[in-house]
A protein has these predicted regions:
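Conserved NTP-donor binding/palm subdomain of two-metal-ion nucleotidyltransferases/polymerases, i.e.
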Residues: 15, 46-298
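Compositionally biased, intrinsically disordered low-complexity segments enriched in Pro/Arg/Gln/His
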Residues: 14-15, 22-25, 29-39, 44-46
Length: 298
């Protein structure tokens, strides 16, 4: 095996460096709202939200969730900005008739939820066991199982590629169409077993804070995550797009190199969500690093 001029740290070193780096979201907030504070939440458009974001959320509420929110008039330029924003989040089909861009993929292009998996081996084995045994249980609920898979898939997308609204909208769409068939007691138990309760609460909180859902529509959470609104707006202002091949290490002569910008972007994303799913974030971190260096020619 050729020696190289670049020393690759072990996966353990990478993980320890990652875990030792402080981040404002790695510690739980000092105060959480009580459920009673959120039972009457309506569409919460903050005073600092610009017209493009307001129309983004209102069009989704009207086209996906059957609401009747008023759409504000905008210039052709702003409609094009909105359409490109929707395209970035995989929701272009709902905005194409309002701007000069072709219809692009939306919810129907998301992979089937049954293909979801977790990077942590123990948690993934638990997910497989749930998926295998649930259809044969006495109180079997396939709708609950499907919804769990949607949450797992959404979580994996957020951790790997950043927050994209196509997945958040899919959660809301399933709740509105099949929410009455979901066994929420069973779902809560599964989320706890998979250590996904906090990040599932974050995903549901984004529905409440931006898309007009009420707390009582989402029985598997008891309060709204305070940071949900800011994280949702950040995803619109500065969407993260991380492609798998951006993270690959390349062996060029005697040197090994990689896309450091993509690596920093990925680790910032991991740190942002570490508090909400620490075990899965750590496993994703190690998995991505090991998968990237495995492509180096020995």
């Amino acid at each position: 095996m050729r020696s190289c001029g670049y020393h690759l740290p072990s996966a353990t070193q990478i993980l320890l460096t990652f875990l030792d780096t402080p981040h404002h979201l790695n510690t739980p907030p000092s105060q959480h709202p009580t459920p009673s504070q959120h039972l009457t939440i309506s569409t919460p458009y903050h005073s600092d939200m610009d017209i493009i974001k307001r129309n983004f959320f209102r069009i989704l509420q009207n086209t996906v969730f059957g609401m009747s929110e008023e759409i504000e008039p905008m210039s052709k330029y702003k409609w094009n900005v909105l359409a490109k924003l929707a395209e970035t989040h995989g929701l272009g089909e709902y905005f194409a008739d309002r701007a000069d861009i072709p219809v692009v993929g939306g919810l129907q292009n998301l992979p089937d939820a049954g293909f979801s998996r977790m990077q942590n081996l123990l948690l993934n084995s638990r997910l497989k066991k749930i998926r295998k045994t649930e259809p044969f249980s006495e109180d079997s609920s396939i709708e609950t199982l499907n919804f769990l898979d949607i949450i797992v898939q959404t979580t994996q997308t957020i951790l790997t590629n950043g927050l994209h609204f196509a997945n958040i909208v899919r959660i809301g769409d399933y709740l509105r169409k099949d929410g009455d068939k979901i066994d929420f007691i069973k779902l809560e138990k599964w989320l706890s077993r998979l250590q996904l309760a906090k990040i599932a609460q974050l995903e549901a909180s984004i529905l409440i804070q931006t898309l007009g859902f009420e707390l009582d529509e989402i029985p598997f959470i008891t309060s709204v995550t305070p940071q949900a609104y800011d994280m949702a707006i950040e995803a619109l202002d500065a969407p993260i797009v991380i492609k798998q091949d951006e993270w690959q290490f390349h062996n060029s002569g005697i040197f090994v190199s990689n896309n450091s910008k993509a690596m920093r972007k990925t680790f910032r994303n991991y740190k942002k969500y570490f508090f909400y799913a620490p075990v899965e974030v750590a496993s994703c971190c190690v998995h991505r690093f090991e998968n990237s260096i495995s492509t180096i020619e020995e």
